[in-house]
Curated annotation (Swiss-Prot):
GO cellular component: extracellular region
Gene Ontology annotations of biological process type: peptidyl-pyroglutamic acid biosynthetic process, using glutaminyl-peptide cyclotransferase
UniProt-listed CDD domains: M28_QC_like (cd03880)
Family that this chain belongs to: Belongs to the glutaminyl-peptide cyclotransferase family.
Organism encoding this protein: Bos taurus
The protein's name: Glutaminyl-peptide cyclotransferase
EC number from the UniProt entry: 2.3.2.5
Length: 361
């Protein structure tokens, strides 16, 4: 995550007006014959019972995630660097080994930067690309470029190696359930899961509309011009995005995630409810009722991040970014030593339950 606070936290009136006119889902509304692009507005989660919640908590492993997913990403990985290539290969290899048979696409392009043209590569991993609708989880895998200082490099642990590792751990822990999405049935919506790892979120110099969000700007434009389902004349891949859940700045202790957008408030409410439910069952560790992670206390400033190019095109967004930012943000101390395992483990459980509920698994 890049830029200083002023350019990233912007006046939100125009964005809130945009999301306010997007269709709001109303519980209990009868769908009838609803166009498939509108089904997301009436989609309801399939809540997990206590036994299933316990299975999720038992099935995720912070130790395995830490060793196999996170540590290989704790390297310098700004766009075009050797570390960027290594991180990209690591992410793809971790996904390719899974049973669920993800379809991987690498979206590589050149873009002008303050330092000339640079190559960027987004990673898009999709379960059942033929499904009309997808729940999308996303993060950025690049790290901000800083000159080496006293032989130290910036590895961006919270920004955003941990979100990448959380998504990889979700794919591993839920592999068996996600494998079943290949078998479309009348009892389940035509809905699947997509993981996006953006390149070039960070600014090379100073945050600006031109020097930031390279990968997400490119991919949003590309998806808007790609027919979906294949051969469609009036719908594109953005129509197929039910909800974009963007993870950023995660891994520091005691995070707070506010709700930014009214049109996705009911899905933020599910995160709140899942957190409360898991705590009541004793499935969250060292979790205080005075420090809830998810707090719906109104709609504050919109933070510039990879969701913006999609939000402007009408995609519903949940922005899971800790606010205020971690104290280590954009410092050399954003490293493994300052991560909080318990917090990450708890958030893994909440996110995995959310995905299972959304996908009716």
């Amino acid at each position: 995550m890049a830029g200083c606070r002023d350019p990233r936290v912007v006046d939100t009136l125009h964005l809130l007006l945009l999301v306010a006119v997007l269709p709001l889902a109303v519980s209990g509304v009868r769908r009838g014959a609803v166009d498939w692009t509108q089904e997301k507005n009436y989609h309801q989660p399939a809540l997990l019972n206590v036994s299933s919640l316990r299975q999720v908590a038992e099935g995720t492993s912070i130790s395995e995630m830490w060793q196999n997913d996170l540590r290989p990403l704790l390297i310098e990985r700004y766009p075009g660097s050797p570390g960027s290539f290594a991180a990209r290969q690591h992410i793809m290899q971790r996904i390719q080994r899974l049973q669920a048979d993800w379809v991987l696409e690498v979206d590589t392009f050149l873009s002008q930067t303050p330092y000339g043209y640079r190559s960027f590569s987004n990673i898009i991993s999709t379960l059942n690309p033929t499904a009309k609708r997808h729940l999308v989880l996303a993060c950025h895998y690049d790290s901000k470029y800083f000159p080496h200082w006293d032989d130290r490099v910036f590895v961006g642990a919270t920004d955003s190696a941990v979100p990448c590792a959380m998504m990889l751990e979700l794919a591993r822990a839920l592999d068996k359930q996600l494998f079943s999405l290949k078998n479309i049935s009348d009892s389940r919506p035509d809905l699947s899961l997509q993981l996006i790892f953006f390149d070039g979120e960070e600014a090379f110099h100073l945050w600006s509309p031109q020097d930031s969000l390279y990968g997400s700007r490119h991919l949003a434009s590309k998806m808007a011009s790609t027919p979906h389902p294949p051969g469609a004349r009036d719908t594109n891949q953005l129509h197929g995005m039910d909800l974009l859940v963007l993870l950023d700045l995660i891994g520091a202790p005691f995070p707070t995630f506010p709700n930014f957008f009214p049109n996705t408030a009911r899905w933020f409410g599910r995160l709140e409810a899942i957190e409360h439910g898991l705590r009541e069952l004793g499935l969250l560790k060292d979790h205080s009722s005075e420090r809830w992670y998810f707090r719906n206390y109104g709609y504050g400033g919109v933070i510039q991040d990879d969701h913006i190019p999609f939000l402007r095109r009408g995609v519903p967004v949940l922005h899971l970014i800790s606010s205020p930012f971690p104290e280590v943000w954009h410092t050399m101390d954003d490293n493994e030593e300052n991560l909080d395992r318990t917090t990450i483990d708890n958030l893994n459980k909440i996110l995995q339950v959310f995905v299972l509920e959304y996908l009716h698994l």
